[in-house]
Amino acid sequence: QFGWIRFMTNRQAAERILSLIDLTNLNDVCTDEDIVELCTRAHGEFGTTAAVCVWPRFVDLSASHLKHTSIKVATVVNFPHGGTDVAAVVDSTLAALDVGADEIDVVLPYQSMIKGDEASVVSMLQAVREIVHAPDHLKVILETGELSDQGIIRRASELAIKAGADFIKTSTGKTKVSATPEAVTTMLQVIRDSE
């Protein structure tokens, strides 16, 4: 799948890879100055990142700073604990979109997934999908380190894709175990099988 990289110079490969990733600051003590620096860093020597990902309280500042660029503003909802309050997640999503978010990264209610409560998972993901319309993107964070079992990771990936996720992601980076090669392999297999 990544054979294209063999035909590129190092600079071309760096530019291509950079254009596919988010530059993120979800530090708990993040400041306005940190966000301005993040937005500035998103324009690098080798091009620009796809997006910056920030706390909801910084969406407006980021959107303002990146207004005349192709860089998208992503934010997180239901983050980092993956709760089950659909109404709160919908409200957070609407508020973020209203102030300029282009991408919503929602944490899947992973405790529900662990308990086998797929209906709660689907309900939340569908509710968010209903309000995140193209060209905006919906990304679903599975929190694979908490799911741990590859069968559950597979099923969570399937549910997210079926609910209309544009992207699936491994983790929040806020748990003891984040991305693992096994989880990534499982997720990639589900993506492949869904095409």
Where are these regions (language model features)?
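Short, Lys/Arg-enriched N-terminal segments with co-localized hydrophobic residues
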Residues: 1-8
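Short, hydrophobic beta-strand segments that form beta-sheet elements in well-ordered domains
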Residues: 51-54
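Alpha/beta enzyme core
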Residues: 10-47, 57-195
